[in-house]
Amino acid sequence: MFAAIASGNPLQLSVEVPNSNGLQHTIVLSRTKPKLYSHITLFILPNVTFPQDYIATVYFKLSPQEEFKLFGYLSSEKPSAIFKVQIPSSKKDAGDTSDGLGEIDMDVDDGSGAADPFTDTNGSSSNNISELIIGISIEPREQGMMKLEEWKASMNAEAQKNNSLILSRPNLGIIRNITTAGQLAQVYPSLTQELAAKIVQHAYNYLSGFLDAQGNVPIKRFDTWWDKFRNRLANDGTFLDEVTKN
């Protein structure tokens, strides 16, 4: 009923799950060539008439011991889809999951763009991941689409969470949310001192060009420096690395 193909590998047909009344299927993609693949095309076979009131939800996992994870669907109006598989290069990478399954982007329909290949936990190409298991469940359209909407909402919530400012303290493995200058100074005291010194030195370098005969600087010159400093910091904070004593 379904088939999948990965670059450099033969076509694999789906197998009906026993006692599922034809509503559940699996496809096992085993690597048969040394070429690594990162895009998987899944489709309904041309000779199959898929009922319009149903959709086929698509799941992935990397081993029989893992739980299936929802990542998309097929239907009569959408008989095929391309999925991009990205395995994290390290278990500590952002977005890594405990079961080793990395990001699978739903419906990369044009198949364009480079994608990371399968990699081991050291970041090098590896054959340690020998198969990828696709699970397909035929469900009533309303039920399946509701499940997909819930999945999308959870993915969006996770993405927003990952976009927050999170810093880790070296050697302690502590992950903290840094929201104030005081918290930053507590977690990274040496780095905070260096940052403060860079800011003061930048101000000194600028203001020293406006000293009067008594060694004073008009306050408006400081205001001008502060406005320029904030604008430059917003555009590219790395300029602070170049601040040195005059």
Swiss-Prot record:
Annotated InterPro entries: Hikeshi-like_C, Hikeshi-like_N, OPI10
SS bond partners: none
Single GO molecular function: nuclear import signal receptor activity
Coarse class of the protein's main subcellular location: cytoplasm
Keywords: Cytoplasm, Lipid biosynthesis, Lipid metabolism, Nucleus, Phospholipid biosynthesis, Phospholipid metabolism
Other facts noted in the record for this chain: Present with 1910 molecules/cell in log phase SD medium.
Name this polypeptide is given: Protein OPI10
Name of the gene: OPI10
